[in-house]
A protein has these predicted regions:
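Conserved beta-strand signature within the Rossmann-like core of class I S-adenosyl-L-methionine
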Residues: 95-103
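Extended basic-aromatic, gly/pro-enriched interface segments that bind polyanionic ligands
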Residues: 1-69, 73-81, 106-108
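A short glycine-rich, Lys/Arg-flanked "PGG" loop and its adjoining helix->strand segment in the class I
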Residues: 83-95
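Core SAM-dependent methyltransferase catalytic element
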Residues: 67, 108-129
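Bulky hydrophobic/aromatic packing residues
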Residues: 15, 98, 112-114
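Pocket-edge structural micro-motifs
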Residues: 51, 103, 127
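A generic structural signal for alpha->beta connector loops
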Residues: 44-46, 96, 113
Length: 129
């Protein structure tokens, strides 16, 4: 099953949710009869999973995004192209939005509207405002 199909389904094994605290799990997931957990409909309705060409982000109808995950992709591009892609993604975020990128995929990149998240487990940035 493809990654986008899995994301749209919004169903996760208990193992996948081990790092999610009980309060969040109870608030945002419904236990299923097969032992998996499904994202609650009110949250699932707010999620957009789309296949995009990162080299054509200017054409993508993306703006005001709350969260963007871009992991295990940037390593395939030259440094200048990575920066271009990251700048476009940063511009697509809503104020307070979160950009999560793969650890080790970005070195020395900064954007004037983004602030690094202080967490050693992830490489992420929030948009000012």
């Amino acid at each position: 099953q493809g990654a986008l199909s899995k994301a749209r389904e919004g169903c996760y094994s208990a193992r996948r949710l081990e790092q999610v605290n009980d309060e969040l799990r109870e608030r945002y997931f419904l236990a299923q009869s097969d032992g998996r957990f499904k994202v609650v409909p009110s949250l699932a309705a707010r999620v957009c999973c789309a296949r995009l060409n990162v080299l054509e982000l200017a054409k993508a109808p993306m703006s005001g995004m709350d969260v963007i995950f871009c992991q295990n992709l940037l390593i395939y591009f030259r440094r200048w192209r990575r920066r271009d892609i990251l700048n476009r993604l940063a511009e697509s975020l809503a104020p307070g939005g979160l950009l999560v990128v793969g650890v080790g995929e970005v070195a020395g990149w900064q954007h004037p509207e983004l602030v690094p998240v202080a967490d050693e487990r992830v490489l992420a940035f929030t948009r000012k405002g």
